[in-house]
């Protein structure tokens, strides 16, 4: 009985460890998006300071290409919208993973108690024999 519970406990621990890896990966992805959001907000602020007489370039591969100011502002705005939506998606994913992780912790605690009871019962049975 104790061996069966131990195997089940080991499987649940592996699930928990995978959830923790996924959680860490999602947090890392969200942090990268936050950095991109900050960077793009700075670009948006800089573009707001320009007027029609200024020349704007964008980097395409190794080449700088002239770009209309309005087009540059629109591109940055769309990028900000996309990044914001991705951050919301990551936050939702993080909430789900945290909820699953908490449930997994509870499952592990229950299995650990079962295992300890089984070990105690086994020790009691072998002590009587």
Curated annotation (Swiss-Prot):
Belongs to the prefoldin subunit beta family. The gene is PFDN6. Binds specifically to cytosolic chaperonin (c-CPN) and transfers target proteins to it. Binds to nascent polypeptide chain and promotes folding in an environment in which there are many competing pathways for nonnative proteins. Heterohexamer of two PFD-alpha type and four PFD-beta type subunits. Component of the PAQosome complex which is responsible for the biogenesis of several protein complexes and which consists of R2TP complex members RUVBL1, RUVBL2, RPAP3 and PIH1D1, URI complex members PFDN2, PFDN6, PDRG1, UXT and URI1 as well as ASDURF, POLR2E and DNAAF10/WDR92. There is a cross-link at residue 66 (Glycyl lysine isopeptide (Lys-Gly) (interchain with G-Cter in SUMO2)). The lineage of its organism: Eukaryota, Metazoa, Chordata, Craniata, Vertebrata. One of its GO terms (biological process) is chaperone-mediated protein complex assembly. There is a cross-link at residue 66 (Glycyl lysine isopeptide (Lys-Gly) (interchain with G-Cter in SUMO1)). The modification N-acetylalanine is found at residue 2. This is Prefoldin subunit 6. One of its GO terms (cellular component) is cytoplasm. Keywords: Acetylation, Chaperone, Isopeptide bond, Ubl conjugation. SUPFAM superfamilies: Prefoldin. InterPro entries: PFD_beta-like (IPR002777), Prefoldin (IPR009053). One of its GO terms (molecular function) is unfolded protein binding. It comes from the Eukaryota. Gene3D superfamilies: 1.10.287.370. The modification N6-acetyllysine is found at residues 21, 66.
